[in-house]
């Protein structure tokens, strides 16, 4: 274990990627950290209110940040251009918020996406959780109530095209480990509903 840098701020569950010898990361404020020199540089802020637990993908010198949530869950996204130091809204939307989804980037433009919150259920929960006593009721509900995504699908980052590769109620997870080994795909634990974690490790063979 090696400490690469000490920062006077904290960032949790935002966007990030490695590009060349640098780490680019942020939540609302954006930063670029040089792994060789230790230099930290402020970059252009995320253009709207910060979002947590979205999907970050590096494609053609741009970081795509999809979905995520704050006081509501989103299906749109923004891309950051490293050369121009600016953000632009992405032309397409993903099928659901991808809040808490797991991903595997197969190649430059194709990403596997597993699980993720249901946008409508999340947005309603933000309202309902303001009511006294509802929190206990919310966390006691069964997983069927939350309607998390049961699909594994392939997203083309370039044009937003979606190909559904599989559907199973056991895929309805958030925060799962998702690993590709040869032609096998391993799904490791993850939450099956808020506050409850699945114990299983699933093996999906020859998904593509």
Listing of model-derived features with the role each one plays in the protein:
Residues 1-208:
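Kelch-like beta-propeller repeat domains
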